């Protein structure tokens, strides 16, 4: 079975506004110009037309692309536990109807997989499998889709504490698939880093990702199950950094073991095509999966210290988030934001959250300053940096956008002390981008946020 390597997504992480009406052409350009072999049609928290999977299939087939063989359309549907039930069911129907069209037009199955976001229990997955089967069966009775065609679910696991237990979760997922009548030998698992970083901080989410990829590699070596991991990462280090032209090589090595990686919006719209090609080459390089030990205690401590660090600023970040524009047809984060469990904080979704910290003068990767200091004090920093070898390069990159003046004015002096101490521990002398910092220190509107994002090469 052919497994795609590059998944083009509709993340609102670019400074360029893309409307839902432009996304069909965007998908075809991703196939033809960017070398992506999979396009995610996104319904999670997003007002995407239900005809879009079918429309992408129509345009791709008209251009002679081998849809269903080397090119795929993969919708991400709303989790019915978290969003409107009706939207979840309609997006599943859109996936099945896209296959009805592609089978009638070309005898191929355009949609082989559907992504289920925020997968934290097997019951929701079983429910969605049942809904998919019911919709496919109804269309088969109308001779609108082949009876032997089925769509597999890709669980999207987006929390560090779930990712570190991924081995047992995968076994439960295979049992759930079997109970739905699917005897699988292979499954694609989507590991997301962005929402995990919002909840737990960058270093906790990165350590959990490395640990999860290691566990999946062991599962594949054992041979009982075959897993193809997808890593969902963007351009900022806080969101994985894999799409960042300055960081793609060290990040690809750090997260070795993935089969598929996302190609998000910023790397296609906010950097040059030549820089995109560097990112693509780095992602497609084959790195040997890493065999190393990551202590759960590090992840727990990093999460604890991150939450402690951001606690005083949650209200201010929610206020500043009004300056961050939406560059896709998204549902407002105030309707569909993120709750950090255990503390009941409602915060913006990952891209707006990330962009807002930059707007406050503090690149969010630097919010792990206290964990850096803790690891150093406990003689664990070398071990942590072996697990996360891209860390120093990430902090050097982020230093270009760190403004002490802006941070002190917006958030106060305590956070600046922590960050400066961590830079000293890592042996990094910040080298701020003077043009960027000058603009940032007087920024207060959405046009400022857009201009700053263009300098960085991403919105958030």
Swiss-Prot record:
GO biological process, one term: tricarboxylic acid cycle
Keyword Magnesium: yes
EC number: 4.1.1.31
InterPro entries in UniProt: PEP_COase_arc-type, Pyrv/PenolPyrv_kinase-like_dom
Alphabetized UniProt keyword annotations: Carbon dioxide fixation, Lyase, Magnesium
Annotated signal peptide: none
Cofactor: Mg(2+)
A Pfam match: PEPcase_2
MF term (GO), any: phosphoenolpyruvate carboxylase activity
Reactions mediated catalytically: oxaloacetate + phosphate = phosphoenolpyruvate + hydrogencarbonate
UniProt record similarity statement: Belongs to the PEPCase type 2 family.
Description of how the protein assembles with itself and partners: Homotetramer.
Reported function: Catalyzes the irreversible beta-carboxylation of phosphoenolpyruvate (PEP) to form oxaloacetate (OAA), a four-carbon dicarboxylic acid source for the tricarboxylic acid cycle.
HAMAP family: PEPcase_type2 (MF_01904)
Full protein name: Phosphoenolpyruvate carboxylase
The organism of origin for this protein: Pyrobaculum aerophilum (strain ATCC 51768 / DSM 7523 / JCM 9630 / CIP 104966 / NBRC 100827 / IM2)
Taxon lineage: Archaea, Thermoproteota, Thermoprotei, Thermoproteales, Thermoproteaceae
Name of the gene this protein is made from: ppcA
């Amino acid at each position: 079975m052919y497994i795609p390597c590059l998944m083009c997504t509709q993340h609102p992480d670019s400074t360029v506004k893309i409307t839902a009406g432009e996304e069909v052409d965007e998908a075809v350009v991703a196939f033809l110009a960017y070398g992506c072999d999979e396009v995610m049609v996104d319904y999670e928290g997003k007002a995407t037309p239900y005809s879009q999977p079918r429309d992408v299939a129509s345009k791709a087939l008209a251009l002679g692309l081998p849809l269903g063989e080397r090119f795929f359309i993969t919708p991400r549907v709303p989790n019915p536990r978290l969003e409107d039930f009706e939207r979840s069911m309609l997006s599943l129907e859109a996936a099945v109807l896209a296959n009805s069209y592609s089978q009638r037009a070309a005898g191929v199955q355009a949609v082989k997989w559907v992504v289920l976001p925020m997968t934290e229990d097997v019951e929701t997955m079983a429910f969605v499998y049942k809904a998919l089967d019911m919709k496919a069966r109804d269309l088969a009775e109308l001779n609108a889709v082949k009876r032997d065609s089925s769509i597999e679910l890709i669980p999207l696991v987006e929390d560090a504490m779930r990712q570190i237990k991924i081995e047992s979760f995968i076994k439960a997922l295979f049992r759930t698939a079997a109970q739905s009548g699917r005897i699988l030998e292979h499954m694609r698992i989507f590991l997301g880093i962005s929402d995990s970083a919002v909840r737990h901080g960058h270093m906790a989410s990165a350590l959990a990702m490395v640990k999860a990829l290691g566990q999946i590699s062991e599962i594949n070596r054992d041979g009982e199950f075959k897993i193809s991991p997808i890593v969902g990462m963007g351009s900022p280090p806080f969101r994985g950094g894999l799409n960042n032209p300055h960081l793609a090589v060290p990040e690809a090595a750090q997260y070795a073991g993935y089969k598929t990686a996302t190609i998000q919006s910023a790397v296609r719209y906010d950097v040059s095509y030549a820089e995109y090609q560097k990112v693509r080459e780095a992602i497609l390089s084959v790195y040997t999966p890493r065999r190393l030990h990551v202590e759960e205690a590090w992840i727990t401590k990093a999460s604890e210290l991150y939450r402690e660090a951001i606690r005083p600023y949650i209200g201010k970040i929610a206020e500043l988030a009004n300056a961050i524009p939406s560059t896709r047809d998204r549902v407002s984060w105030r309707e569909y934001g993120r709750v950090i469990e255990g503390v009941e904080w409602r915060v913006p979704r990952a891209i707006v959250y990330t962009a807002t910290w930059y707007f406050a003068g503090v690149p969010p990767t630097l919010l792990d300053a206290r964990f850096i200091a803790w690891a150093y004090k406990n003689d664990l920093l070398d071990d942590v940096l072996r697990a996360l070898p891209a860390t120093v390069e990430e902090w050097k990159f982020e230093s270009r956008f760190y403004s002490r003046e802006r941070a002190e004015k917006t958030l106060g002096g305590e956070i600046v002390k922590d960050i400066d101490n961590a830079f000293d521990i890592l042996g990094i002398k910040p080298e701020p981008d003077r043009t960027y910092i000058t603009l940032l220190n007087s920024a207060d509107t959405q046009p400022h946020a857009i201009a700053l994002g263009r300098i960085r090469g991403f919105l958030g």
